[in-house]
């Protein structure tokens, strides 16, 4: 969506003593280590790790979204952050660090939908549809009233403290107290081995000039255009309504989609591009080409490329060959972005 600059909400835990409020679905045992699971190889033994997969609730997500939008307008909320990867651990530490303060949480007050959850499980659960707020002291009831209106659970689970630490209480005892700089700024950086595989090197040494052309190029063309990666994608995007909210100027099938911004004379041009075969042959060059292609498509639609985000999906980075591919792809994106002066 599109938001106004004055409506942007920040994730800074400010104001010593201000309450930390948990908003959204109860915490369960689903999603524990979900972020790390996303980078693991899947095999026959992966079935045992199904609890690492988060259980979504789209309806609750919509209620949380609407409740948060109203909360931001009432003036009682100072900051907000979603509970994404690492759940409460990530949201609480990042908010406290960005605010230049610390945070104390009472895990007994965290809404839970599973019995006998340990502090470890509560802090690392990645259950969906949850937000962490810092509200102005004394205005908690305003937050609760709005949450009740939208039938969204809410509970004060802690407060902002002056010490730069994350302090956790459970069953009346302090079970953890960690300095924020050790969790965030001073955390160790991986130094992994990166090696191009023999298969990768052999692919790069192949020369298309040495290949024999088939006698019937027409038959070859027919074979190529039925390959899903090369064929028209109309059969997919034609099943979806591309005119939702009636802001679409240029729909799917063009170089880039163009969406009007209501109330202005501006529009957004967006393109998603990438050629897996190029990246497979040469991750660095292939990634450069992907950025350049997306930029050209935006330009050909009348736009000016402003920024991009990546959709990198690789295998297990603990394998030297896989890490080499990832490293080279990032380097390729970097080269293209520096050349085109595009922030990532």
Model-found features: residue ranges?
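Glycine/proline-enriched, intrinsically flexible loops and inter-domain linkers
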Residues: 1-343
């Amino acid at each position: 969506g599109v938001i106004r600059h004055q409506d942007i909400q920040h994730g800074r835990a400010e104001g010593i003593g201000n309450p930390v409020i948990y908003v959204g679905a109860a915490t369960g045992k689903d999603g524990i280590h979900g972020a790390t699971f996303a980078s693991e190889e899947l095999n026959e033994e992966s079935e045992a790790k199904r609890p690492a997969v988060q259980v979504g609730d789209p309806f609750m997500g919509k209620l949380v979204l609407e409740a948060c939008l109203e909360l931001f307008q009432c003036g009682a909320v100072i900051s907000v952050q979603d509970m994404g990867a690492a759940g409460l651990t990530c949201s609480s530490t990042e908010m406290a660090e960005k605010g230049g303060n610390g945070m104390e949480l009472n895990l007994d007050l965290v809404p839970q939908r599973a019995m006998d959850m340990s502090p470890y499980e509560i802090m690392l659960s990645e259950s969906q549809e949850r937000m962490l707020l810092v509200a102005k002291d004394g205005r908690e009831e305003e937050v609760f009233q709005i949450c009740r209106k939208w039938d969204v659970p809410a509970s004060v689970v802690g407060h902002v403290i002056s010490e730069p630490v994350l302090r956790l209480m459970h069953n009346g005892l302090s079970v953890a107290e960690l300095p924020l700089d050790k969790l965030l700024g001073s955390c160790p950086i991986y130094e992994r081995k990166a090696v191009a595989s023999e298969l990768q090197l052999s692919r790069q040494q192949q020369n298309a000039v040495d290949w024999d052309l088939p006698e019937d190029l027409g038959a070859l063309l027919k074979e190529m255009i039925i390959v899903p990666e090369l064929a028209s994608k109309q059969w997919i995007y034609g099943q979806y309504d591309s005119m939702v909210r009636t802001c679409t100027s240029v729909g799917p099938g063009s170089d880039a989609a163009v969406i009007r911004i209501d109330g202005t004379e501006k529009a957004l041009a967006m393109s998603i591009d990438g050629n897996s075969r190029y990246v497979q042959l040469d991750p660095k060059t292939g990634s450069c080409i992907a950025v350049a292609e997306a930029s050209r498509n935006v330009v050909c639609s009348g736009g000016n490329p402003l920024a991009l985000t990546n959709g990198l999906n690789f295998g297990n980075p603990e394998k030297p060959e896989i890490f080499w591919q990832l490293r080279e792809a990032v380097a390729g994106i970097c080269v293209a972005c520096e050349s085109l002066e595009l922030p990532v």
